[in-house]
Amino acid sequence: MERSDSRDFYNFAKTSSDNNSALFDASQYEFFGQSLEEVELGGLDDDGTVRGHVDDEEYHLFDKREGAGLGSLSDMDDLATTFAKLNRNVTGPKHLGVIGDRGSGSFSRESSTATDWTQDNEFTSWLDQHTVEEQVQEASWSSQPQSSPNSNSLYRTSSYPQQQTQLQHYSSEPIIVPESTFTSFPSPGKRSQQSSPSHIHRAPSLPGGSQSNFSAPNASPLSNSTFHLSGLSHGPSHYGNNLARYASCGPTLGNMVQQPPHWVTDPGLLHGDHSALLHSLMQQQHLQQLPPRNGFTSQQLISLQQRQSLAHLAALQSQLYSSYPSPSHKALFGVGEVREHKHKSSHRSRKNRGGISQQTSDLASQKSESGLQFRSKYMTSEEIESILKMQHSNSHSSDPYVNDYYHQARLAKKSSGSRTKPQLYPSHLKDHQSRSRNSSDQQPQVHVDALGKITLPSICRPRALLEVDSPPSSGHKHLEDEPLVAARVTIEDAFGVLIDIVDIDRTLQFNRPQDGGAQLRRKRQILLEGLATSLQLVDPFSKTGQKTGLTTKDDIVFLRITTLPKGRKLLTKYLQLLVPGTEIARVVCMAVFRHLRFLFGGLPSDSLAAETIANLAKAVTVCVQAMDLRALSACLAAVVCSSEQPPLRPIGSSSGDGASVVLVSLLERAAEVIVAVVPPRVSNHGNPNDGLWRASFDEFFSLLTKYCRSKYETIHGQNHDNAADVLELAIKREMPAELLRASLRHTNEDQRNFLLNVGRSASPVSESTTTRASASGGQINSEFVRG
């Protein structure tokens, strides 16, 4: 600012103060001296034209030397008390036309004044700043003369709503203060342009969004500049003479920057607590009673320092508060109320200021300590949040055993031979609900999880996939009555049970519980028994004593499941998970031996289906190898009592050899058990299990000899005219030689003679061989049996 401009400015201020030396009369304002509940603050509901600025004649600059005409201290105290009450009303409980309680988290929507107060989204920070402004400017307002008795607008009060639109800018918007053109004290020619509140350039107290580095070049101008209270309180340029005295006696901004614990590291200041700042500002207010030593020099000094201090102060405070959103500001509103004004405020910010920092402020305001909050018409935010948590827990599991099972299983299989084998087991096991014991209950207990998946408590009663009410005369069946559909549903549910059993086994292997796994083993046994019950298998040798004859419909569920290739896979997996030698293993194996022709009667052309049948035969063989003589006798009796003739083919037959494989394993296991259990030269009639075995084997041997005789007659009739070598090859290809060899250890003398006669009729046997066989006491080696 030029020296001539400063002199004109000083003369104008002196003349204005001489002509307007009247005392400030607060009683002419309608809201002074009245009850605050009955005050209707002017301007909030006024739809008229808003004044752009105040004429120069309303508020005149005055010199500090005219302080003698300020009036008594009691008037100042009354005015301060009135403004203090007004401030408490603003920040206190909710009244008509006044912003509601801070602790309530919202304000009254019914009040028209409250609606006007919410013109922008950033007014939350204005409440805290407004408290600082009112207390800082009490002395300045009390010392200003009133020029016009008709003036009813006071720009520094909290009741003027249009000033709010300007004060809202510094909540989250960076305020860019140009250093080259900014002047706190305009020249007389430009005074009218900056007298209006809409043209005032302020240094905000709580800005956000701007970034600045505290480097030496940036902080150096601050150390030489004076910290003016008018910069913080956003005072208009009319109070220029007051700024002059602040420049002479106020604390410097450089000193405050040199104290990082107060400006930077103070958590209360960064989080909306302005008590420390307010205390320091009030102390500075009492130190401003001394007049400036040289007003002319002060005016010139203020012009230079104000440009530097306010520019750097804006950048400094923008950095301090841009990355530290105050929780108290968030608590003023719920997230739902903020979202109501988000669209309008964002649109207005993008139109006026670019909208970059506004979007950042909106995102920051939506982040609260309790997480996201939702608004709905029929549900509360807690209910919506609980549903989202349930869905997230079901669809976003942190267990790699569930999310990345195939990769983890591949790693475990790849490193099976290494020392550091990865532990493949679930972090928690599935909790199965207990099934209702009431047999008369026809409705299954259905559990629906968060994702809508329906878990059946029992697979023996699958839930209907489609409910359709058909006419009684219609011959169509319900979908649940279709046999294969019900079988597929049962297979899928049974595989789910088997997966749970595998999880229990892996948990027992890698993570043994404190009780040694007794509870998990009990749970595993219950699941296996429930699956056997679901298959509806019949046990003629059950301990209940019900030894009734078998019917064709006894194993109907078992047959329907094993009709499908996936059902055979289920049976194979189930046999592999059974504990060998248990009653469940015996019951399942008896069902397999009753239906040897159904399971192993033909070899399918599909390689995968053929492999499934071969795996089923191997699984049955493993279970048989752990059976005792009683279980072996029951399985062999199941073969004899079956209504179907077993396919007694030689092992390696192209038509399928599964039945012969399991029968050979049964006969060999029985020979081992008999030798270990029954002492030699002891009568077999004393052991009931041995008697059952003898009866079962006699029936089986009779069945085997009949099959061999019929097969021999068929082969001999087809190859009667052929040579002996061709006949011998045909007999070898069709006769079950492995079954005959496995049966030799269980035959008596009559049965051995029969086998000898079959061998003689099958091919010529040398007389010397027959003589040696007779001399050996009737013991016939397997080499003697041809074919």
UniProtKB/Swiss-Prot annotation:
Biased amino acid composition, Polar residues: 105-120, 154-171, 180-198, 208-221, 355-373, 436-445
Cellular component terms per the entry's GO annotation: Lsm1-7-Pat1 complex; P-body
PTM annotation (Phosphoserine): residues: 184, 192
Low complexity bias: start-end ranges: 142-153
Gene Ontology MF term list: mRNA binding
Disordered: annotated segments: 94-120, 134-221, 338-374, 411-445, 765-787
PANTHER family: PROTEIN PAT1 HOMOLOG 2 (PTHR21551:SF24), TOPOISOMERASE II-ASSOCIATED PROTEIN PAT1 (PTHR21551)
Protein name: Protein PAT1 homolog 2
Lineage: Eukaryota, Viridiplantae, Streptophyta, Embryophyta, Tracheophyta
